[in-house]
């Protein structure tokens, strides 16, 4: 069965979908100095650069005053993103939701006040999908995944699998991650995964595959996709293949030989040939090398 992507929405440090597309196609960068907290308060916050998304729930009438007070901001982002997905004509009993909060839930518990910290919405990561179910009356399967950097694409793959198995006809799938928080920078800083060499020139900090790369730039945002078994006049693309595996290696670094990455890409591409490769491209010395080596050994470098 072919699964189609019929709609999408996103929030990035550029802004919404239109602003993001404009920024990317004009070769702009959307990260800069950290403004959401003082990075000088901790010796572990060596990286001073971030891709921040600034959100005002009042700009989205779909989010009620009660929800603004009650829900973690990441959940509000998801509701706002879902409001930009066209659900007209869909059978709501056959429409599911797989949306995940990334690490937002844990960070929002840390920054919430005592009253909100006792709120179940801050403790149950699946509530982010459940809130979309309730808001739009979608009674199909509801779930979430949490797999670090691959959380969003995992959600999309599981959504496609659910459609192929006949469990649902449509799925809203994706992830949001509200990560600009002191503890995120402390923990990533301890792992030495963040760029620290370009604090004074933040526009140069993220440089995947560059010989001067020194780490990633922590950023935040989210994206949702509408997957369906039905092709429409608004269909954006179709899913021709996917694969999932893992290195069984280090927590924050791929195996340097890239063999497992190569196997995953080979499995995903068995029925298709790509015209564009969207790499992970973390701008870390080990990660970029292993990924590029795997691509080259697959013969996809051209």
For each feature predicted by the language model, list its residue ranges:
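Short, well-ordered amphipathic alpha-helical segments that serve as non-catalytic structural scaffolds
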Residues: 76-87, 126-129, 257-272, 294
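Conserved catalytic cysteine-centered active-site region
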Residues: 32-76, 102-111, 117-158, 190-217, ...
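Active-site-proximal alpha-helical scaffold in enzymes
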Residues: 79-83, 136, 143-177, 216-233
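Beta-strand segments within the central parallel beta-sheet cores of soluble alpha/beta enzyme folds
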Residues: 96-99, 142-146, 168-176, 236-242, ...
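N-terminal amphipathic, basic-rich helices that act as targeting or association modules
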Residues: 1-8, 67-91
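Phosphate/pyrophosphate-binding loops at sites that engage ATP/ADP/AMP, CoA/4′-phosphopantetheine
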Residues: 82-95, 135, 231-236, 264-276, ...
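Acyl-CoA/ACP chain-elongation machinery
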Residues: 167-207, 213-214, 242-256, 279-289
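Condensing-enzyme catalytic core mediating Claisen C-C bond formation in acyl metabolism
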Residues: 2-10, 17-36, 41-45, 202-276
